Amino acid sequence: SGKVVCVDKGEWDKGGSPEHIDLFNEEWIAECREHLTENGTIWISGTYHNIFSVANKLTQLGFKILNVITWAKTNPPPNISCRYFTYSTEFIIWARKCPKKPHYFNYDLMKLLNENKQMTDVWRLPAIARWEKSQGKHPTQKPLALLTRIILASTKPGAWILDPFAGSSTTGIAANLLGRRFLGIDKEKQYLE
């Protein structure tokens, strides 16, 4: 369509060696685990570059993986190289801290939001809207609709939500709109100002 599209996802997404990626994931997931309640859950999004390492580290650290959501973007960015299929999905792992402790899942609301049918693990939602992107410059910002669904599915009003990679704080905005408490962390100062 003649539009210029940025495909830079940020310095942190460039990875490094598999060993470096694994070590990084182990460290931050272990830190999050320490702060989760016994029946707490964690949601982690990523692309194929990182998500398999994340899944392995979650399992090694004692989490029980509940679902791997496939976020099928209804408006993916174009495939500029034309050498492979257009990349239109991201994966979101939902896991609970303790395999034997029950977690909260708002099954009825998820069913209601899905025309009274069980919600599947494939979520067809658009990528970030232009109006949302105007609120921040984070290259991997997630859409408000995605974070809203995650929060509604797995927390009760008043619950604490931690986002250790807060970026432009879409998670915080969704948490606030839904009556949850929020703590966001980001190592990049430009996103905290």
Predicted regions and their residues:
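Core catalytic lobe of class I
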Residues: S1-L192
